[in-house]
């Protein structure tokens, strides 16, 4: 006797290949929606951060150590958008990796390197803002272009060296070879590292984040004190000199920049905290996190690369003006690099 009910056919990533991963595709409706959502994030990360880089490099008024750091941060986020997110999008939605083992390693390496590079950039930007707000008179001599260059170099070299060591030496899988072998299949690209390296990953997130929290806490305390002093001084002396007025405007601008970048730091922490906690816990409970939970955490982190340009556009009038000049083609005109972007 045969049953009238048949099990749905098992789908594989590669139908005619032994050891293929099992494919668990979405139905057409959710599939289209996910491609639109993830694709929009990738396009926003690429286009938005490219506008930031062009703005800082083209307009001479933006050539400052702090803005060079911001441009370098935007470069890291741009690379996440163009080299990581599109391929992760296909993997997340199709539940298969179709780009080969070699590119899987490269993709994972770039994923980790560029994301940790963003964290280090934000950490150095916090240091820059701390000096600018707490010691504005000596800031130009302390945080020079050469110092900014050193910070940028560290923010790129350390993550690249670390991620290369993790994915190309095999040391991250030491002690869990049997688990890696069990999870390995054709059409898969899953990052599995041992508990020691998961702890290192957590520290690479936690230490810069802790530094940022401490520095921005001090920044906002100092900024509040400065605001009170300036209000008192203006009310006591209506006829203040132009020099004092200029100092007050500069201090106000530095505080506003610190607040804006503080929002950027908060966005980074909110975006990355779920993924970091999930990775830490998962390594100690046998990697049992459901696929959909992992994907939510992962894309929450990816979307951080698309958020920074939106934050700049919302808080920085100069960035909005730069975008208009770029999109209208005004930057193609001669002497466009010397245009004024600030209202004062």
Swiss-Prot record:
Membrane topology: Multi-pass membrane protein
Molecular function in Gene Ontology: trace-amine receptor activity
Record key words, sorted: Cell membrane, Disulfide bond, G-protein coupled receptor, Glycoprotein, Membrane, Receptor, Transducer, Transmembrane, Transmembrane helix
Tissue distribution: Specifically expressed in neurons of the olfactory epithelium.
Protein family per UniProt: Belongs to the G-protein coupled receptor 1 family.
PANTHER family: HISTAMINE RECEPTOR-RELATED G-PROTEIN COUPLED RECEPTOR (PTHR24249), TRACE AMINE-ASSOCIATED RECEPTOR 8 (PTHR24249:SF405)
Name of the protein in its database record: Trace amine-associated receptor 8b
Organism: Mus musculus (Mouse)
């Amino acid at each position: 006797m045969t049953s009238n009910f048949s099990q749905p056919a098992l789908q594989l990533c590669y139908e005619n290949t032994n050891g293929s991963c099992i494919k668990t595709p979405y139905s057409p409706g959710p599939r289209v929606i996910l491609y639109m959502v993830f694709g929009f994030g990738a396009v926003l990360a690429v286009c938005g951060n490219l506008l930031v880089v062009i703005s800082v490099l083209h307009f001479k008024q933006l050539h400052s150590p702090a803005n060079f750091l911001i441009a370098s941060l935007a470069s890291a986020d741009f690379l996440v958008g163009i080299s990581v997110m599109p391929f992760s999008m296909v993997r997340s939605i199709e539940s298969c990796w179709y780009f080969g083992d070699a590119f899987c390693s490269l993709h994972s390496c770039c994923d980790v390197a560029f994301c940790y590079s963003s964290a280090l950039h934000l950490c150095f930007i916090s240091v820059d803002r701390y000096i600018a707000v707490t010691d504005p008179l000596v800031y130009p001599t302390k945080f020079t272009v050469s110092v900014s260059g050193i910070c940028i170099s560290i923010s790129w070299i350390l993550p690249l060296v670390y991620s290369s060591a993790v994915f190309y030496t095999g040391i991250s899988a030491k002690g869990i070879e049997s688990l890696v072998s069990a999870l390995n299949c054709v059409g898969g690209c899953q990052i599995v590292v041992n508990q020691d390296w998961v702890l290192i990953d957590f520290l690479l997130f936690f230490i810069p984040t802790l530094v940022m929290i401490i520095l921005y806490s001090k920044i906002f305390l100092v900024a509040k004190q400065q605001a009170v002093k300036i209000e008192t001084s203006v009310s006591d002396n209506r006829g203040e000199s132009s020099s004092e007025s200029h100092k007050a405007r500069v201090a106000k601008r530095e505080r506003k920049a610190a607040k804006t970048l503080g929002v950027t730091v908060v966005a980074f922490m909110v975006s990355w905290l779920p993924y970091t906690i999930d990775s830490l816990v998962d390594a100690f409970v046998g990697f049992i996190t459901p696929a959909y939970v992992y994907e939510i955490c992962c894309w929450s982190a990816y979307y951080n690369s698309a958020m920074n340009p939106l934050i700049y556009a919302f808080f920085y009038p100069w960035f909005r003006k730069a975008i208009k000049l770029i999109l209208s083609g005004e930057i193609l005109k001669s002497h466009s690099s010397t245009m004024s972007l600030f209202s004062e």
